[in-house]
Design a protein with these regions (language model features):
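Extended, well-ordered alpha-helical scaffold/bundle regions in very large, multi-domain proteins
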Residues: 247, 285, 297-306, 310-359, ...
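Amphipathic alpha-helical segments that form the core helices of the histone-fold
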Residues: 250-263, 325-333, 338-348, 381-383, ...
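Hydrophobic h-region of N-terminal signal peptides that target proteins for export
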Residues: 11-21
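Loop/turn elements at helix/coil->beta-strand transitions in domains of secreted/extracellular proteins
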Residues: 267-269, 280, 320, 353, ...
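Aromatic- and Gly/Pro-enriched helix-to-coil junctions and flexible linker segments
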Residues: 20-216, 237-238, 242-254, 258-262, ...
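Extended surface/linker regions that mediate inter-domain or inter-protein docking
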Residues: 97-101, 111-114, 121, 125-227, ...
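Sequence context surrounding c-type heme c attachment/ligation sites in exported
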Residues: 21-71, 75-92, 96, 444-573, ...
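Bacterial N-terminal signal peptides that target proteins for export
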Residues: 1-12
Length: 627
């Protein structure tokens, strides 16, 4: 499979390509790279995976060689090559140059280059080193305008009063990514039919209410057209937060009169109200409707900024106060953004912005899916996942209230909040290994330093990243690889039977030895070592010393993770967590995920300045999310 982020890697390679011919680059830089890092496993004496690289030519006209080059490109991009067993590893700059050279040469040969960096789940393919490089902070933002559906809550608010059995804009579960992302959801014919039915039901009720106002205006001397226009203006403000243009008003009045003539009053007003709801502007979020500057960039209008900020922090369209604030020409858009963000975060009566922060952590740590992981009830322990999720929600909110070193606290805290009533009813204190005589308390419960540490050892997270009947170190390691280390793992090939042997007398570590086969371990080497330390807990999230009457092995060795301070031998989950919590790289990766959640897209190199400023603000404010 040939893939690459054309905008990032090719932009790095093209300036060099203007100075050196492809053959010279191949001879001077690509061949030495292959010889140093690849030929020992893919040369004349050994061909792992039946791949040989020492006899490749710079030309990509041969189809078989082009396929090998594309596989090499993928392996370097996902840091599969060289393997973790290698003695030498290339620098990031060396790897980027070879990636750029392969991508450019493939394209010159007329081969398609699939762009993945803009797709959901592939944001880590954009170079982390470049995103946080001072040189890249001067690059202009180079992203396409976003277009995506409004949130389910926004649709429900728009058609309030209509009975919604199933919201057609319902979001998928995160599955490791974020639920709402630009371009993630299509708008199909079934969805259009459902939205139309909701719009008609809502408009029928609203039109009847509007008739009362129209009758009142008529009694005060208004002409029928004036009264109808006033009703349309009010509904426009309620739904779209603006007044209709002259052309829009003329079209809607024509529709009203036509339907009234054919079906009678107030069917015309009902049709107009439904038409307002069914406008693309009501159902989708648009950007970039203004004029481009001399460099081709389009700045968001003040109204677009208001809509973007409101959806980012509340998942709803902007309220009247926000729209009025952005109409203030005496303030710059940046100052208004800061002021309105502060207003929403400080709003105690409607703490929607704080709930939105909770939603980010729910999707980032992906622990709500614990409720979807079926577990057998076993003697002496009654599993109740919703209460565990509630506990972790409470811990996140408790941390956000303090708003100091938020990520580090969530990764390393020894204090958990245990929801008393539900756990007393369902027996969940046992999952925390609390003693039988434990006295419930609304205060945080402090655990011994050798038993629990932060979210990654919380029962809710452990259950969410487990199977129905066993632990899943692969899934846990994959989460760490993506969400904290900021790297990637290739998609599972369609011909792979991802299944462990069913041997009830073997420990999970022993059963996982099948993943050490050469064709498997190039990917599993990036997940298994990160997930194995969490074998300290069973798949219910209970702390343990033994597995199948054998001492549980929680040691691991991390090699070439991309984060040097994380590499090395680890003796358990706490040592691994502390290394990641103290890593600047992991903190920067966290900032990248915050960016993706609130902007609804992956970052590009043009966002380097924004990300660097966001990370600096986080540091300067002592790890504050509000900063």
């Amino acid at each position: 499979m040939i893939f690459l982020v054309r905008n990032s890697l090719l932009s790095l390679a093209l300036p060099m390509g203007a100075l050196m011919a492809v053959e010279d680059e191949f001879k001077d830089r690509v061949q030495p790279f292959l010889k140093t890092y690849c030929i020992s496993c893919h040369g004349p004496e050994k061909q792992k995976g039946k791949i040989r690289l020492d006899d490749l030519a710079a030309s990509m006209n041969d189809q078989k060689e082009a396929e090998i080059w594309s596989r090499t490109l993928e392996s370097i991009a996902f840091a599969e090559m060289p393997s973790d067993k290698a003695k030498k590893f290339p620098t990031k700059e060396e790897a980027r140059f070879v990636q750029g050279w392969i991508a450019r040469t493939l394209e010159q040969a007329g081969l398609a280059v699939e762009e993945k960096g803009d797709k959901e789940g592939y944001g880590n393919l954009v170079s982390h080193e470049l995103l946080f490089s001072p040189v890249e902070s001067k690059r202009a933002i180079d992203v396409a305008a976003r277009l995506w559906r409004v949130s389910p809550q926004a649709l429900a608010n728009t058609v309030r009063g209509a009975r919604i059995v199933s919201n057609p804009f319902a979001l998928d579960k995160p599955h490791g990514n974020f639920r709402d992302f630009k371009g993630k959801y299509t708008f199909n014919s079934l969805m259009a039919e459902q939205v139309t039915e909701l719009a008609l039901a809502h408009s029928e009720k609203e039109a009847k209410n509007a008739r009362k106002m129209i009758v009142l205006l008529r009694k005060r001397g208004s002409a029928i057209d004036e009264a109808n226009q006033e009703a349309i203006k009010r509904h426009y403000h309620n739904v779209l937060r603006r007044s209709p243009t002259e052309n829009e008003m003329n079209a809607l009045m024509a529709l009203l009169k036509k339907v009234d003539a054919e079906l009678g009053v107030p069917r015309g007003l009902q049709a107009v109200y439904a038409a307002i709801i069914l406008q693309p502007e009501t159902l989708f979020r648009f950007e970039g409707t203004g004029d481009a500057d001399e460099s081709g960039l389009v700045a968001l209008s003040r109204r677009e900024l208001a809509i973007s900020l409101s959806f980012a922090l509340t998942d709803l369209p902007p309220d009247t106060n926000m729209l009025r604030a952005f109409e203030n020409e005496e303030m710059t858009p940046r100052d208004i953004l800061l002021a309105e963000t502060r207003r929403l975060l400080d709003d105690e009566k409607r703490p929607v912005a704080r709930k939105r922060l909770l939603q980010f952590f729910q999707e980032y740590f992906d622990y709500e899916k614990a409720e979807d992981v079926f577990k057998d009830q076993i003697k002496g322990h009654k599993h109740w996942a919703p209460a565990l999720v509630y506990d972790l929600n409470a811990l996140v909110m408790h941390t956000l209230e303090k708003d100091k070193q938020v990520l580090k606290t969530l990764l390393t805290t020894r204090e958990y909040l245990v929801y008393v009533n539900s756990h007393r009813d369902h027996g969940n204190p046992l999952v925390y290994n609390l003693p039988p005589d434990w006295k419930p308390t609304p205060k945080p419960v402090r655990f011994p330093k050798d038993q629990r540490m932060g979210v990654l050892t919380h029962p809710a997270w452990l259950v969410a990243h487990s199977g129905n009947f066993d632990n899943d170190p692969i899934r846990r390691g994959l989460w760490i690889r993506y969400k904290l280390l900021g790297s990637s793992v290739p998609d599972v090939p369609i011909n792979v039977d991802a299944k462990l042997p069913d041997e009830p007398t073997w420990t999970l570590r022993k059963r996982m030895h099948v993943t050490r086969e050469d064709e498997c371990y190039k990917c599993h080497s990036k997940m298994n070592p990160l997930g194995m330390p969490f074998e300290r807990y069973d798949h219910y999230g209970r702390f343990r010393f033994n597995e199948l009457d054998k001492p549980v092995d929680v040691t691991s060795k991390l090699v070439n993770t991309g984060v040097p301070e994380v590499d090395g031998e680890v003796n358990g989950p706490f040592e691994l967590i502390e290394r990641m919590a103290n890593s600047t790289r992991c903190e920067q990766v966290f900032v990248r995920y915050v960016f993706r959640f609130f902007l609804g897209r992956n970052e590009t190199l043009g966002d380097a300045k924004t990300l660097q400023e966001a990370h600096k603000a986080y540091l300067d404010a002592d790890g504050s999310m509000e900063a």
